[in-house]
Structure formats: structure tokens, C-alpha cells
């Protein structure tokens, strides 16, 4: 039964709402996915709307011509709680401008809600999401991509928690003052920095999730060792499809994540599973089959799906 549910979930999140693609999922699976989507709460761990809207304003409370997320498409696809990514580029890692940008992007999400309180609501707890689901609202929880705005100050961590941030992706495309990045060959800290280890403890104390997407393998294992709470990979995929690419997680890491009680939201698009970005459906079928293999190695609760809308080519 759990395996059948996992296979349905692949179609549920991958097939729903993806229009204009060369290939289509079988009609029976699509119908089943649509039925489940209307009754279940669907969470997406990482959607890059705030940075997109801040860079080039568009009203996502209405249908939009570009991008991958707006209210009508979210409703059509059954998406209930997309985490709004408060993304800060690595170029701002050593600048207080990172704090300013993070606050501005949070303001952007709050403005979206203020513009359409009959459509969206900020969510800071699971209870918020469940209540808003019953009210017919799309919940907008907040996650910070790149911990640069913390700037080595736990007071900033508290500030952003108070503003609604409920997870932090420790690093992004470069190593920062918290953690080494999977993309950065320099590996400055050989995992987490001394401050990064302190930060893990305080995030646990606050009840803020630790996101290990983008971090190096060493940093991942150090987080698993230090964290007293389950951690997440908000938008990563499986290294089986991309041998040698540290951005994705290998089977040993998935086992460790499962033992921690955490979850990986598997990014199923573009170069995360295939160099040929437009062959997404064939690779998705392969991902479904590999998912079944991974179920034999880790807990079913460890695996989920994630689209990284706006940043990923499908």
C-alpha cells in the first residue's frame, strides 16, 4: 500500500499543472492524481516567487503569462502550501545587504497576501496550514535559501524566525560563513563552520528546520550528527541519476536522512535527473522506478517530490 501511494505521488506532483509539455502522463494516473490533489494537503518545499516578483513585478494573485506559479495554476494543480523561497544570492554572503534583501523579500510575500487575503495567507505552523486549507486559502510558509542574512549573529536568526522563516538552506552556490556548498571546490570549512555548528543548535531550540539542499556531503553528515530534530532537503534529487554530482544525495545519505526522521523533496526536473531537460517524462518514469528501489533502503516517510518552480526547466 505504501509503495502504491508513492507511485501515485510521483504522478500527483509531476503531472498536475505541467502544461505545454511534449509528453503527457497516462490519463488514468492523471485522473487519480487530480482526485487526491483535491482532498490532500500538498506542500512544495521551495518556490522562487519572491525573488522573481522583486526582480520583475508580476501579480501572482492573478493568472500570469510567464513563470511557473500563480494563484489560478496553484488551485488547478491542488497546491496548498508552497514554501516561498527567500533567496539571497551568494554574491551577498559577506554583506549586510543580504539582510536587507531578505527583509524585502519577506515584505514581498506579505504584500501578496495583503493584496489577496481571500486567496493567500502566511503560515508559520502546521496548524496554520491545516486551518487555511479548510478555509480554502493557499498557505505561504517561508523558507530562507542561503543563510547569509544571519551574518554570524544569532540575533538575526531570532529576527527572521519572528518574521516567519521556518527553514534555512544553510548555503547556496558558494561556501559561506555557515557551511560549505556542494558547488564550491574550495571546501573552506570541511563541512560546517564553528558558527554553523552553533547555529544548528539554536535552530533546534527555536524549532526552525535545517535544510541541507546545496551543502557539501561533509556538511550534511555533520548536520545529521548535531541536529536533535529531523532535517529536510527542500529541493534535491538522487545521485543515481547524476553520478559524481554532489548537489544530489546518494543512497547512504538517504539512509542517514531516514534514520534522522527527515525528508528529501526530490526535484524531478531538468538537470537534476537528466542532461536532456526536455526528456522529463521518460526520466520521471525512471525516477518512479528508482523511487521504489530507494523505498527498500529507507523509510517511505523520507521521500517526497519538489519542482523548484521558476528555476527548473521542465
Segments from the language model and where they lie:
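Bacterial N-terminal signal peptides that target proteins for export
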Residues: 1-10
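Bacterial N-terminal signal peptides
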Residues: 9-19
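N-terminal hydrophobic targeting/anchoring segments and the immediately downstream early-domain regions
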Residues: 21-190, 239, 243-314
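Distinct, well-ordered alpha-helical segments
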Residues: 153-157, 219-229
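An acidic- and aromatic-residue-enriched active-site/binding cleft used to recognize and process polar
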Residues: 173, 215-217, 228, 236, ...
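Short, contiguous, pocket-lining structural segments
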Residues: 188-195, 211-216, 249
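Alpha-helix-loop-beta-strand connector modules within alpha/beta enzyme cores
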Residues: 188-204, 223-233
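Substrate-binding cleft of carbohydrate-active enzyme catalytic domains
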Residues: 198-212, 216-222, 253-259
